[in-house]
Amino acid sequence: MSGKSVSFYVSENIDVPLQIKILSLKGKKRQLRASEKLIDPQLSLTMSNVKIFSDMLVSVQVYDELTLGDVTVPVFAPYVPFRYGRNWDQWVTLPVSVRHLTPACKLRIVLWEFNGQRRIPFKTITTPIFKDLDFTLKRGIEAIKFTKQGKPSIETVKTLETINKYFYGDYAKKEWIDELVLKKLYKEYEKIDLPLDTFMLTIQFPVIELPIIYTEKPREDIQKNIPTLSNFDAASAFSVDHSTSNNTAVTSVDPKLKIPMGNKYNSTLKFYDPDQFNNDPIEEKFRKLERASKHNTSDKHVKPDAKKRDYLKKIIDYPPGKRLSAHEKGSIWKYRYYLQNNKKALTKLLQSTNLKDETERTEVLEMMDGWAEIDIDDALGLLGHKYRNLAVRTYAVNRLKKASDKELELYLLQLVQAVCFENLNTFSDTSNSKFTVVDFSSSSQMMKTRNTQRSESQNIMNSHIENNNPKFIHSIHSEDDSQIEELPVVISPLAEFLIRRALVNKRLGNYFYWYITSESYDQPFLNQILESFLSRLNSNDRNEIEKQVKLLTLLRNCCEEIKSLKDTVSKKKELLQTLLSTKVRPYLKKRLVKLPLDPDIVLNDVMIDQCNVFKSSLSPLMITFHTENGGVYPLMYKVGDDLRQDQLVVQIISLMNELLKNENVDLKLLPYTILATGLEEGAIQFIPNLTMADILNKYHGILPFFRAHHPDKDEELGVKSWVIDNFVKSCAGYCVITYLLGVGDRHLDNLLITEGGQFFHADFGYILGQDPKPFPPLMKLPPQIIEAFGGTDSSNYNKFRSYCFVAYSILRRNAGLILNLFELMKTSNIPDIRVDPEGSIMKVKERFNLDLTEEEATIHFQTLINDSVNALLPIVIDHLHNLAQYWRA
């Protein structure tokens, strides 16, 4: 044995939960001046603005940086009241064992403060669990320094380093003096003075005498006695039959014992290769040498034969998100010049390129300029989080410039999410490209213009955030005006493009503003983009947005006041009508307001007698507005519910509807509008309808409901033909779409039908295969719908199936676009995506069945319809749901 030895633990053997100790938070925030409190009293609700050591909560969570998925749920440290400083000194036990952690796992520590009745984030801090240098689990105390707007960084504090060395055992322990010295060291740390609005959080990892080194746990099904060439012997005393019937005998024998090869008729054995999933170093070296020459003229003239062309076509036709093997990447790279005229091949070339390698990156970026122009769906794919090279993203933005405003509106929600990837801190590779920097301070005249526009834009932001967005508050008020004016506004290429298009098209500008506003709760740096957009608007357009913000603030105040009233629905309705007549109506009488849900509609009054309060714990409001052209626009306004998931689903339905119409297939879909105007508030377009449950209770069937409104004795079913046509088409469209999106929790109370026969779904709280009920059907097709068709032998049922097949076929052809849009939403805070980003995209991809031919896909969908028609369990669950609703009432 060597004279020197190193002792350590391996993480795969540490089956204990991870613990983190929250010690203290140092630092002070600038307090509000008396004048600021008078100007905006709402700012005083944020406790840290008025109290130096305001109460705070701390939550700790483990997440995986590679998959962007959460490993654990957030765990809160016990509440501790503060007096002279923010000191917790509390251990938090996380529900994950050390052996399950990887170097990609990080801690997400969120400091929470109070804003009136709400809990809002003060700062989100991330820190690795393992050291980057040697992959050892962190030990001892760690200090994390941060500002409200800056990126947190681990601070080296000599006092804490000394304490850690004591914990590690580097100093000899003497009990009589250790306690005194430690107290003095802690006091010295407390004396550290930090600048105003600068903070330092100290946490402690468990102190273990020996370091814990990360090791990957081998697979559980690994063969224990691994066969090698040195221990095979055909003349072994063991027979193949004996080794097969008694595995224990084989795996527990002396290692020197020969393992039988078997007889000549059965000589095939399975080997375990521990390196089977690792990169082959020889192939890796070959790849580097092959691609090292920048001017490899031979590749420019290489052309594939017929067999190779088919192979390349197969690779190019892979759906977005599919990983390429090393051989597939090599083939794409070899024939890259041949593929330059194939617009679909560019994304596969980028997948096959190591953009971190300067030689490869330079060559590919040069080739992109001469590549065949890619489609918009491929351009969207290049804006995902996987592509961090700004030259690639700028190339995609240049392609988007050729898209029409109507197309951009369809993708705007995802494009705003893509802007979130372009935070300066997230890019490690900025070569061959740069950000567009909009610096208004370049001249005194520009500076003067900016000051005027900035003050107006901040008025809009202030009026909107007073009840909604506490993260805006600090970004506007935490620094002196002189400090703010010195900062340039840094805008990424995509954000700059969207701002310019939003300035030209007022409809795009309306949705851009509200999408950015709702996302800024999770991405504070979006405030900078929002401010840049507002500062460039002319005074009339800024005034329009300000009026919208004010109207929604009035509605929010009405909703919160009604929610606080603990009384009957009729009393709440009376209060609503009083509030609308005294607050909302006078506001609309003085000015015309463009509807945020649809800026083409202008509101001039509210129809108080047609407004109501829904029976729900959130007390959503039913508001009917009178429009400038003499029409009415009913909508539902909710506070306390995150509508961003519903907004996403309805946007995808609208997109699919447009894709179908582009193929001259109109399935009479009703993609009503949903707009999330904040983290937990928003508006929903209200379409007059009845739920299937109400129709069955009142009319005892769908056909009697149609006959009551559109009778026709000359028709076979006694209903006007256009009503049945609407019903059959819309049922087919929504069956296909809800199947593809994995919409769950379907019951007769969220299946809706209009008097004109249009069928549609509501309430998208469960998507992508999520469902609160056991054994949910892949497609919801109640027997009452089949009965309304005229039965399974009717012509309407055959039409329904044909429409389903056509819609499924068209949407499969556009699967790349839909999957790329979901890829852009992968890092969003949509609940059913956030729980498993990779898995959620995979579920959508699986339902497209892209590996099937057109005929096989049609047969697959026919089987789905047959299973749904004959399913009994959904009928039982519907009855149980109705029974539960009855007892709740």
From Swiss-Prot:
Residues 607-873 form the PI3K/PI4K catalytic domain. Residues 761-782 are annotated as: Activation loop. Multifunctional phosphatidylinositol 3-kinase that plays a role in signaling in modulation of host immune response, intracellular survival and virulence. Catalytic subunit of the autophagy-specific VPS34 PI3-kinase complex I essential to recruit the ATG8-phosphatidylinositol conjugate and the ATG12-ATG5 conjugate to the pre-autophagosomal structure. Also involved in endosome-to-Golgi retrograde transport as part of the VPS34 PI3-kinase complex II. GO terms for biological process: ascospore-type prospore membrane formation; autophagosome assembly; cellular response to potassium ion starvation; endocytosis; intracellular iron ion homeostasis; iron ion transmembrane transport; pexophagy; phosphatidylinositol-mediated signaling. Residues 613-619 are annotated as: G-loop. Its EC number is 2.7.1.137. It catalyses: a 1,2-diacyl-sn-glycero-3-phospho-(1D-myo-inositol) + ATP = a 1,2-diacyl-sn-glycero-3-phospho-(1D-myo-inositol-3-phosphate) + ADP + H(+). One of its GO terms (molecular function) is ATP binding. It is found in: Golgi apparatus, trans-Golgi network membrane; Endosome membrane. The lineage of its organism: Eukaryota, Fungi, Dikarya, Ascomycota, Saccharomycotina. Keywords: ATP-binding, Autophagy, Endosome, Golgi apparatus, Kinase, Membrane, Nucleotide-binding, Transferase. SUPFAM superfamilies: ARM repeat, C2 domain (Calcium/lipid-binding domain, CaLB), Protein kinase-like (PK-like). This is Phosphatidylinositol 3-kinase VPS34. Component of the autophagy-specific VPS34 PI3-kinase complex I composed of VPS15, VPS30, VPS34, ATG14 and ATG38; and of the VPS34 PI3-kinase complex II composed of VPS15, VPS30, VPS34 and VPS38. It is a peripheral membrane protein. Pfam families: PI3_PI4_kinase, PI3K_C2, PI3Ka. Disruption phenotype: Leads to large vacuoles and defective respiratory growth. Blocks maturation of the phagosomes and renders cells hyperadherent to epithelial cells and susceptible to the antimicrobial arsenal of primary murine and cultured human macrophages, as well as to thermal, salt, oxidative, genotoxic, cell wall and cell membrane stresses. Displays defects in protein trafficking. InterPro entries: ARM-type_fold, C2_domain_sf, Kinase-like_dom_sf, PI3/4_kinase_cat_dom, PI3/4_kinase_cat_sf, PI3/4_kinase_CS, PI3K-type_C2_dom, PI3K_accessory_dom. SMART domains: PI3K_C2, PI3Ka, PI3Kc. Autophosphorylated. Gene3D superfamilies: Phosphatidylinositol 3-/4-kinase, catalytic domain, Phosphatidylinositol 3-kinase Catalytic Subunit, Chain A, domain 4, Phosphatidylinositol 3-kinase, accessory domain (PIK). It comes from Candida glabrata (strain ATCC 2001 / BCRC 20586 / JCM 3761 / NBRC 0622 / NRRL Y-65 / CBS 138). GO terms for cellular component: endosome membrane; extracellular region; fungal-type vacuole membrane; Golgi apparatus; nucleus-vacuole junction; peroxisome; phagophore assembly site; phosphatidylinositol 3-kinase complex, class III, type I. Belongs to the PI3/PI4-kinase family. Type III PI4K subfamily. Residues 742-750 are annotated as: Catalytic loop. Residues 34-184 form the C2 PI3K-type domain. Residues 298-540 form the PIK helical domain.
